Amino acid sequence: MIDEAKRLAPRFAARAEAYDRDGAFPVDDFADLRQAGLFGLMVPERLGGAGAGFARYADVAYELARGNGATALIFNMHASVTGALSGVTDELADALGLPPEALEARDAHLKAAANGSWYAVAMSERGAGSRLSQMSTSYEAVDGGFHIRGAKTFCSGAGHADGYLVAARSAADPSQVSQFLVPAGPGLRVE
């Protein structure tokens, strides 16, 4: 994967000035990342990924940043999601009392990343930044899942990601904060 990042960096560098000048999302960079399989960097091998840990991720991110720092930063958001999901081992999930459905969802999202899906982090809110203690986005359990209400004010890659890691506070118990991987599509609006 390091070799892929080194190969891509000059391509990213050649496009970086135009993306910055136009204030545009680096669409071609992300197409290259997808084609190179880098969205599966931190996905376990058993789920089709490269199984990289943090040190290998940092080496790859360094090479990507040599080409375009903005692309590397947005890629970092994706890696933080896949790295966190990969860190929830079956043993940890069992110790936390997570239901089997949570593990199935974890594996499905990680397999999707290994196949080219990428995820952004939607955390920041007006007046709260990314401080979870001041967040107002809330969720409640509904038949078949959860309903999340709220607005995030900043998200690197908004409008381009396949899913968003969204932090929300329980409407029933405001002291409880959970994170949801929300797929792009109906019910999610990016402005």
Where does each model-flagged region fall?
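Glycine-rich flavin
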Residues: 31, 41-149, 156
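A short core secondary-structure module
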Residues: 151-190
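Glycine-centered structural positions embedded in regular secondary structure
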Residues: 9, 119-120, 168
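A short, acidic/glycine-rich surface segment
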Residues: 132, 190-191
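Alpha-helical interface subdomain recognition
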Residues: 1-59
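Generic secondary-structure boundary/loop-capping signal
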Residues: 22, 44, 71, 129, ...
